[in-house]
């Protein structure tokens, strides 16, 4: 067992203890504001080096950003759907996970969210109006490949965001955001080359969305899940035909933007 000389607690251990308390505050208090280093020194009764080390620990975890220079201070970043999706995406990218693998995972998970929407007792008042509005918006972008893809993906994001189970919403929402980023990159590339699918195919996607909303409104969960899976497979095939063996890319600017657009929880 390692002993501490002169009975003093190592600075690293002090910093970890301070970091643990600040971490708990960030996670437990929604609008937590980090005190100044001077105040933290007083609150914890420790040295400035220990406080700075604690902040470095939290910064590596993505919970704070320490501002250097004359301004100083630190900004708090409370974890949410956006950060969950981004870090998951980086993990998949590091593991060299392909778009084909991500698509297969979504095939198993996303359609169940459509079924859960159909089981909500308040679906007629909460879910259906929002999904219908999203479809109506996408209709206005038929003929504009990039904008239509973005709007159509927003519909998928909404379906997941209305899933009552928080754990499923966070997990599946992260995968949906990652896929959306890849599909939007595909749309931009195909549009530049004049190869984006025809307006007829875009209109078919709109019809598929409307049929799905009809099943959700009627409370037919099994049929909603079946339709969602069939539609998802059809739209994924367009991307996988060219990019199926590419590795998920969460670090690209477009991917980060798509992930940041994840909708907040909708219960």
Q: What kind of region is each of these model predictions?
A:
Residues 94-101, 118-122, 139-143, 192-201:
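A ubiquitous short alpha-helical element
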């Amino acid at each position: 067992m390692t002993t501490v000389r002169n009975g003093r607690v190592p600075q690293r251990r002090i910093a970890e203890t301070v970091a643990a308390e600040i971490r708990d505050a960030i996670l437990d208090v929604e609008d937590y504001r980090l005190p100044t280093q001077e105040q933290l020194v007083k609150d914890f009764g420790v040295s400035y080096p220990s406080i700075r080390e604690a902040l470095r620990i939290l910064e590596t975890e993505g919970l704070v950003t320490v501002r250097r220079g004359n301004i100083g201070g630190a900004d708090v970043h409370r974890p949410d759907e956006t950060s969950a999706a981004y870090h998951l995406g980086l993990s998949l990218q590091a593991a060299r996970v392909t778009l084909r693998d991500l698509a297969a995972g979504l095939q198993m998970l996303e359609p169940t969210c459509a079924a859960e929407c159909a089981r909500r007792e308040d679906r007629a008042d909460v879910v259906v109006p929002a999904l219908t509005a999203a479809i109506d918006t996408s209709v206005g972008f038929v003929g504009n490949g990039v904008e239509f893809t973005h709007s159509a993906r927003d519909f998928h994001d909404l379906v997941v965001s209305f899933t009552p189970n928080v754990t499923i919403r966070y997990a599946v929402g992260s995968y949906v955001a990652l896929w959306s980023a890849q599909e939007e990159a595909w749309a931009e590339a195909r549009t530049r080359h004049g190869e984006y699918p025809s307006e007829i195919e875009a209109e078919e996607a709109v019809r598929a969305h409307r049929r799905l909303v009809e099943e959700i409104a009627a409370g037919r969960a099994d049929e909603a899940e079946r339709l969602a899976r069939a539609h998802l497979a059809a739209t994924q095939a367009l991307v996988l035909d060219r990019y199926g063996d590419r590795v998920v890319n969460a670090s690209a600017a477009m991917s980060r933007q798509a992930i940041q657009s994840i909708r907040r929880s909708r219960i």
